[in-house]
């Protein structure tokens, strides 16, 4: 089946839904969601969204400086200035769409402070800001007559000249995107979605790691598809490991203990109740995430333990319950009263700072294709993302991409020559077993060899094992009917390869990329 839309938005988190709402008055929008609308990464973001709002003590220059420091001075300054200066207007837009940020007794925003921030500037809704934003946007999107939501639809490939029989390489000029082939999981058929403009808002890729705070749908689909289509992908070595995921064996994904809990006064301690962050950074538990994650990783290895602890027992119990009601309930459900007990925590893969390279308008290297949100690489994060800068980046770049797309929409039309998907092939139980086991192997490889601390030997081993793993799904994809499981495996191996290759290419330790073979930053 062939479907035609002015705008094809693949991904339904804060970035995808914001873009859809900003362009829907000018054309028909298809919003593709690989699972349910609530399963986007946005829904699971706890801490909040960063923006300068209290001008009595804060200003843009401070937020810019904090972002550059966290990014280890390799962030794109233009991207940083854009996001920081345009943030307040996008906060107003979110409020207009129904998002309810917490206020204090004076009616002003109740601001949190998180690691790496010099001021209180984190807007939040209790300790489930992402869920509040996602729920508000879902209601607004569903009410819009020009936005059609396709749940349980999975993007298999973006459509370029390659599908017209033209050879496309990484040196081909003028690659263009004409839409995407989308698998309807209900029917098992792959439909052809033609569009004038296509937007990737597919989120992150942290499900390639065994320990992750991300929903397991975060398999890097958008990044992998654009890479295979010969688009530019950048900074994949910079995987952020959140320092404080709840340690509870068997949980996958891991439950996130928000950064805001350390901003609130939480202290990292060893099993015997001793503080340790003073050995690593003068900012103690409020140091940027890469420093805290490496410190925890080192303490765990020194002691042969699986976790450390976060202590908020010295804080007022009622205040703790008020600020962190969901964390309180979650921990209580496994027998931990955070007002009396230490919280067991360990690092887990949390955020991809790199992705599909885009310009200040969110345009990728492929014409008519934009990338926004976590799947994109705007340059904002550099070597490490500052806490709570991701949600604001998503809405600022959704706005930029929407404005640019609307300004060029009339130049584009549908490409009527695109062939429909070749649906031949079968899927047998043996193939499904192979896929499931291969996914587990990818998780094990990435966790063991491409984690918080890396080395040349570990990276080479990961490369070789991923290379072996790639052959089977590549053959299966040619002879089997397309399925979500097979496509996800192929994407996960592509993502593992990209992270490993770009980590091997960076001959220094910088931001989130730390290698024992090159322990210092190259200051050239």
Pin down the residues of each PLM region.
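An anion/pyrophosphate-binding glycine-rich loop and adjacent beta-alpha core
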Residues: 225, 231-338, 343, 395, ...
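FAD-site-proximal beta/loop scaffold in flavoenzymes
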Residues: 157-169, 178-187, 336-380
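Conserved N-terminal glycine-rich FAD pyrophosphate-binding loop of Rossmann-like flavoproteins
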Residues: 35-68, 72, 240, 251-255
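Rossmann-like flavin
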Residues: 70-110
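Glycine- and aromatic-enriched mobile tails/lids
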Residues: 1-6, 22, 36-38, 44-45, ...
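Short beta-strand to alpha-helix junction loop
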Residues: 75-88, 121-139, 150, 212-220, ...
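N-terminal Rossmann-like FAD-binding beta1-loop-alpha1 element of flavoenzymes
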Residues: 7-31
């Amino acid at each position: 089946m062939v479907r035609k839309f002015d705008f094809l938005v693949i991904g339904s988190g804060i970035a995808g839904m914001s873009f859809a709402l900003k362009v829907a008055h000018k054309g028909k929008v298809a919003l593709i969601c690989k699972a349910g609308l609530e399963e986007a990464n946005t829904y699971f973001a706890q801490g909040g969204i960063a923006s300068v709002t209290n001008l009595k003590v804060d200003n843009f220059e401070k937020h810019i400086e904090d972002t550059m420091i966290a990014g280890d001075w390799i962030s794109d300054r233009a991207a940083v200035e854009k996001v920081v200066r345009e943030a307040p207007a996008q906060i107003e837009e979110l409020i207009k769409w129904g998002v309810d940020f917490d206020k204090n007794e004076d009616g002003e925003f109740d601001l949190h402070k998180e690691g790496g921030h010099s001021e209180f500037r984190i807007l939040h809704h209790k300790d489930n800001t992402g869920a509040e934003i996602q729920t508000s946007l879902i209601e607004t999107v569903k009410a819009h007559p020009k936005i059609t939501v396709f749940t349980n639809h999975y993007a298999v490939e973006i459509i370029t000249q390659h599908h017209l029989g033209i050879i496309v390489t990484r040196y081909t000029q003028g690659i263009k995107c004409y839409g995407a082939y989308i698998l309807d999981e209900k029917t098992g058929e792959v439909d052809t979605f033609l569009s004038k403009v296509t937007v990737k808002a597919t989120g992150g890729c942290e499900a390639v790691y065994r320990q992750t705070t991300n929903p397991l749908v975060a398999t890097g689909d958008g990044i992998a598809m654009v890479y295979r289509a010969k688009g530019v992908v950048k900074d994949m070595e910079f995987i952020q490991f959140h320092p404080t995921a709840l340690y509870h064996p068997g949980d996958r994904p891991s439950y996130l203990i928000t950064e805001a809990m350390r901003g609130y006064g939480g202290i990292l301690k060893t099993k015997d109740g001793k503080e340790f962050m003073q050995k690593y950074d003068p900012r103690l538990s409020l140091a940027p995430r890469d420093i805290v994650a490496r410190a925890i990783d080192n303490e765990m290895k020194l002691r042969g333990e699986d976790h450390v602890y976060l202590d908020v027992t010295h804080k007022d119990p009622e205040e703790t319950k008020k600020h962190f009601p969901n964390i309180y309930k979650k921990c209580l459900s496994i027998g931990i009263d955070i007002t009396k007990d230490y919280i067991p925590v360990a690092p887990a893969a949390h955020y991809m700072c790199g992705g599909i390279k885009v310009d200040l308008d969110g345009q990728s290297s492929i014409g008519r294709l934009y990338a926004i949100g976590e799947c994109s690489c705007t340059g904002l994060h550099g070597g490490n993302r500052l806490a709570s800068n991701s949600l604001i980046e998503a809405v600022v770049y959704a706005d930029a991409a929407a404005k640019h797309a609307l300004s060029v929409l009339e130049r584009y039309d549908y490409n009527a020559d695109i062939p429909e998907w070749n649906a031949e092939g079968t899927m047998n139980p043996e193939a499904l077993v192979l896929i499931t086991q291969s996914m587990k192997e990818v998780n094990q490889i990435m966790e063991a060899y491409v984690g918080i601390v890396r080395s040349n030997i570990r990276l080479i081993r990961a490369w070789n094992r991923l290379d072996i793993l790639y052959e089977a799904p590549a053959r299966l994809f040619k002879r089997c009917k397309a399925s979500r499981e097979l496509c996800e495996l192929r994407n996960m191996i592509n993502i593992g390869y990209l992270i490993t290759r770009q980590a091997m290419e960076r001959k220094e330790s910088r931001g989130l990329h730390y290698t024992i073979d090159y322990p210092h930053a190259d200051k050239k």
